[in-house]
Amino acid sequence: YWQSIRQKTMNDKEYRDDDVVVIGGSDWKPGSENKNGSKDSRRWKMAAIFLAAALVMLGGFFLGKHLYYNHQFNRSRPDSEIISQLSEPMKGKAGISLEQQEAMGVRMKIYALTGLKAHFCDSVPDYTDSSVFFITRSSDYRIKDGKKQIIGDYIEDGKIISESLWRAGFMAIKEGNAQIGISRSRKIGKYITENQGSMFRQLALVAGGTTCEKQYILKGKVTRCAYARDLEGNLYFIETVNPETLYGFADALIEYGFVDAIYITGGTQPDRFYRQPDGTSHGQYIDDKPHELIVWTR
């Protein structure tokens, strides 16, 4: 009897002390779950590393593209300086002074603007009004589905009408004070919108005294026009006397001493309207299409 009890106790002890407990059947082996878990963990870690590397490469690509796009052309001054100068009225007595010059074989009519304020207009104003001194086109447009669409950024009195940064040249206006420049940043457009100003974009011809060949999408020879700025910050409107390529026109502007220039379509007018500082008017403004205009007043 005592022997049988002792045998039973030993059997119970053996069962309790046995540290191998079969749970998953005969195929289960100690440590197999940990090994599979480690493999899965390594796979997830490798996938995360590859994903992070891909995101870094993709981010670097888009950052590089953004920097190249925004800084493709030289700048004669930063956007912050242009914004600051938009608070400064144009110097001099209100009026337009005309002279003819030649550079690189290109004959040009150069209209110097002084003491004037710029305004957007969608129709030709009465330029017999003594307050009107000069009129030119501003942005371009296309007709799509029977509707007029302005090309490039176009902001009028703080209202965004069109958005596109590809055309790197621009004219910005705040309270009549105008500045031209070359930049694809949205910084100036944001400032103009917040301050109820106006802005349009055009093809860049000259940026920081260098050509902007990637913007020269208009081929052939026709008479050309542009707004340009010199080192002193004075603003001019230039038109060629004879048909020229954009390359030849830009080279002539640089040779003459302009540091920035933006293109204006429409070509030369046979006898363009302008008003001298003494109030004497000349010529007339002709435009048979509904272009957006810049009107300069005192």
Give residue spans per PLM region.
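Short, Lys/Arg-enriched N-terminal segments with co-localized hydrophobic residues
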Residues: 1-9
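Zymogen propeptides
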Residues: 11-164
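Short beta-strand-initiation
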Residues: 93, 106, 166-168, 200, ...
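Short, surface-exposed beta-strand/loop micro-motifs that present aromatic residues
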Residues: 98, 225-228
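Structural motif
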Residues: 132-135, 169-170, 177-180, 203-204, ...
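Active-site-adjacent helix-turn-beta-strand microarchitecture at beta-sheet edges
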Residues: 136-137, 142-216
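Conserved, well-ordered active-site substructure
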Residues: 145-164, 217-221, 229, 234-260, ...
